[in-house]
UniProtKB/Swiss-Prot annotation, chain A:
UniProt-recorded name of the protein: Aspartate carbamoyltransferase regulatory chain
Keywords, alphabetical: Metal-binding, Pyrimidine biosynthesis, Zinc
GO biological process: 'de novo' pyrimidine nucleobase biosynthetic process; pyrimidine nucleotide biosynthetic process
One MF term in the entry's GO annotations: metal ion binding
Designated gene of the protein: pyrI
Cofactor note: Binds 1 zinc ion per subunit.
Quaternary assembly: Contains catalytic and regulatory chains.
Stored PANTHER family: ASPARTATE CARBAMOYLTRANSFERASE REGULATORY CHAIN (PTHR35805:SF1)
UniProt binding sites for Zn(2+): 108, 113, 136, 139
Cofactor(s) required for function per UniProt: Zn(2+)
Curated annotation (Swiss-Prot), chain B:
Pfam families according to UniProt: OTCace, OTCace_N
Protein name per the record: Aspartate carbamoyltransferase catalytic subunit
Cross-referenced PANTHER family: ASPARTATE CARBAMOYLTRANSFERASE, ORNITHINE CARBAMOYLTRANSFERASE, MITOCHONDRIAL
GO biological process: 'de novo' pyrimidine nucleobase biosynthetic process; 'de novo' UMP biosynthetic process; amino acid metabolic process
EC number(s) reported in the record: 2.1.3.2
Organism: Pyrococcus horikoshii (strain ATCC 700860 / DSM 12428 / JCM 9974 / NBRC 100139 / OT-3)
Gene: pyrB
Quaternary assembly: Heterooligomer of catalytic and regulatory chains.
Matches recorded under InterPro entries: Asp/Orn_carbamoyltranf_P-bd, Asp/Orn_carbamoylTrfase, Asp/Orn_carbamoylTrfase_sf, Asp_carbamoyltransf, Asp_carbamoyltransf_Asp/Orn-bd
Length: 152, 308
């Protein structure tokens, strides 16, 4: 495998197998642009991948993301794998999983839903993971994959 | 589940046991109301009715219910007479009103508004309709009406007629009926069939369902015919609407071959889907249904206030 063009990190988290083009969204959802520990965040886009054809990779220096935190990106990057790095070595590896409840990331696609008018954190219940289907806690309307992606 | 302080937002939050508690409390209160006239359960309590959208039956029956329970009522019947017109948020309106009252009833044009209100308020909130989403007290009074007429809900053949696609009333009613052993007949024009995901969910819950476009073919089977309005604006052109409209009107002719015990319900307001000539037949119970709104709402108010 050709060596990556971005440097390896000593300590931190590598989020691999992000669908090409979703890397920036992943950074946004995880709030990584405001990393307070002084560590760097490296983003590689459109990297060749055996599994996906093309993929994005995000490397977060000096921060170990928990499964719960990372699961927030499951909607934009369901294929993502997460590697926890210590002393340049992968010490833990897991796949992202769609959580049971999604809070704050998603906008309700129902134009008449109160969440589109009032100051309120959105909340959705995942009623099916495959195919993905969620129900709004407020207006109770369901959204399927295509609509979900359009409202992220 | 503890009733005192509980919010009534969606029929989805109800178990069968919850429904039964409401129905039996309503029965008890109706009886007491007949005996004593005026009750005292909610003496000293204040209900706030916040109607951001107009309503005749729901608002007046809630107010009547609170008065019958011995409580008092404050509120507004349209948003234009409140600070909402000045741009006040729902959150702030609720935070304010809860300082003045013990329970809130809200109707709002936006879906999810009642759920949000319930989260903002420390006092119980009852949903009286949020956009096209939920209207749980209507469903409860419908169930109460059926139970009162037949003594039971189990074993009945119940037909839902009209706009089954957009009608929130029929969706909630169908979901609640899934707790009981009923056969459900879904009668509507092709264009206004009940959404597939709801029909599937009901079937998964073990309900026997017959879908048809022809009222005359199934009406002879039914114990209950629940009629709803077919709105003109749902059709691409007027001709199509007129074609459909005629075949879904309940009149004396179509009632020639029905069971003697058939009961016809309607959430009202009606336009012309039930001919007024039907009103005087023994089948028509839609005005009794209106009456039943009072004991059912009395029951809900008394339960969430924790005074019964």
């Amino acid at each position: 495998m050709p060596e990556l063009k971005v440097s390896a990190i000593k300590e931190g988290t590598v989020i691999d197998h992000i669908p090409a083009g979703k890397g920036l969204k992943v950074i946004e959802i995880l709030g990584l642009s405001k990393l307070s520990n002084g560590g760097s965040v490296l983003l590689a886009m459109n990297v060749p991948s055996k599994k996906l054809g093309r993929k994005d990779i995000v490397k977060v220096e000096g921060k170990f993301l928990s499964e719960e935190e990372v699961n927030k990106i499951a909607l934009v990057a369901p294929t993502a794998t997460v590697n926890i790095i210590r002393n340049y070595k992968v010490v833990e590896k897991f796949k992202v999983e769609v959580p049971e409840v999604i809070e704050g990331i998603l906008k309700c696609g129902n134009p008449n839903c109160i969440t589109n008018y009032e100051y309120v954190t959105t909340k959705f219940y995942v009623i099916s993971k495959n195919p993905l289907k969620v129900r709004c806690h407020y207006c109770e309307r369901t959204m399927e994959e295509e609509e979900i992606l359009a409202n992220l | 589940m503890e009733w005192k302080g509980r919010d009534v937002i969606s029929i989805r939050d109800f178990s069968k046991e919850d429904i039964e508690v409401v129905l039996s409390t309503a029965e008890r209160l109706e009886k007491e109301m007949k005996e004593k006239g005026q009750l005292e359960y909610a003496k000293g309590k204040i209900l706030a009715t916040l109607f951001f959208e107009p309503s005749t039956r729901t608002r007046l029956s809630f107010e009547s219910a609170m008065h019958r329970l011995g409580g008092s009522v404050i509120g507004f019947a349209e948003a234009s007479t409140s600070s909402v017109k000045k741009g006040e948020s729902l959150r702030d309106t609720i935070k304010t009103v809860e300082q003045y009252s013990d329970v809130i009833v809200i109707r709002h044009p936006k879906e999810g508004a009642a759920r949000l209100a319930a989260e903002v308020a420390d006092i119980p909130v009852i949903n009286a309709g949020d956009g096209s989403n939920q209207h749980p007290t209507q469903t409860l009074l419908d169930l109460y009406t059926i139970k009162k007429e037949f003594g039971t809900i189990d074993g009945l053949k119940i037909g839902l007629l009209g706009d089954l696609k957009y009608g929130r009333t029929v969706h909630s009613l169908a979901e609640a009926l899934a707790f009981y052993d009923v056969e459900l007949y879904l009668i509507s024009p092709e264009l206004l069939r009940m959404p597939k995901h709801i029909v599937e969910e009901l079937r998964e819950r073990g309900m026997k369902i017959v879908e048809t476009t022809k009222l005359e073919e199934v009406i002879g089977e039914l114990d209950v015919l629940y009629v709803t309005r077919i709105q003109k604006e749902r059709f691409p052109d007027e001709q199509e609407y007129l074609k459909v409209k005629g075949s879904y009107q309940v009149n004396l002719k179509i009632l020639e071959n029905v069971k003697d015990s058939l009961r016809i319900m309607h959430p009202l307001p009606r336009v012309d889907e039930i001919h007024p000539e039907v009103d005087k037949t023994k089948h028509a119970i839609y005005f009794k249904q209106v009456f039943n709104g009072v004991p059912v709402r009395m029951a809900l108010l008394a339960l969430v206030l924790g005074v019964i």
